[in-house]
Amino acid sequence: TRECTSTLVLEGRCRLAFKLLRAYQNEFRGVCCTPGALSFYRADYVRSVADEWLSQRFRGQPCTTGEDRAIANLFLRDGWLTAYQENAKVYSKMPATFAGMCRMFLRWARSNIRETVFLFSFLFRRFRGAYLNTFRFNMVLATMSLILPPLLIAGNIGALFASDGYVFHQYLAVMTYALSVAVIYYVNERDSDWVWLMIYEFVWVASLWWIIPYAFATLRNTGWLTRKVEAEPVGRVLRAQPVAC
């Protein structure tokens, strides 16, 4: 929901994750994270892996977050194709404070690291026929994008004092990247949210670069972090029912 600057920045982040990233992954039917907000799965397959999914553990701890990425990994491992429906519309409650936004990004980063480790346990097996090498190549690139940016930023911090004009050059590099993403988005969507995509890139470099390194250092922390109210217990088990599409 559009409540404040934080939620608008987060909307820009979601636009990037869906309109660009998942739309691209859809081209080779390899969406690696089917979003928990709205996804449809084959019920018979979910039943067959339900115990494995629900009892997943990582480094000795039960996995309580990232269940959407986890179920997508199971589908991919067993040869299913995953897709993104571009015209689906979902409304979600986002953190309205910077601290809440950081906690949410930490939760996402920890589960992303965990599920990337799981992904590599089968990535180089012949687990599917269609688009196999394309999927492998893109997952390796995605992993590099998870690891390299924090290392580059850490190196840049050390170089701040070594060269005159270094900050200005780095500012131009970030501006070029942010503008490129915004242009690609605008060409495809033709709306004003490209502005928030640009702002998100600057916010990430300036104040969120530490998220991934800290997530690596605190992988054993499995808390939800942004949930304020305890979920009410479900009185009965809801069985999956077929629906008309």
Question: Where is each model-derived feature located?
Answer:
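Loop-to-transmembrane boundary segments
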Residues: 127-144, 238-245
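Membrane-embedded multi-pass helical conduit in multi-pass membrane proteins
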Residues: 137-223
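Transmembrane alpha-helices
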Residues: 6, 38, 42, 172-177, ...
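Membrane-proximal soluble regions of multi-pass membrane proteins
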Residues: 100, 104-110, 115, 196-236
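Short hydrophobic alpha-helical module
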Residues: 108-122, 130, 143-160
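Non-transmembrane catalytic domains and loops of membrane-associated enzymes and transporters
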Residues: 1-127
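Short alpha-helix boundary/capping motifs
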Residues: 74, 102-104, 133, 234-235, ...
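Short linear elements at protein peripheries
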Residues: 35, 43, 223-245
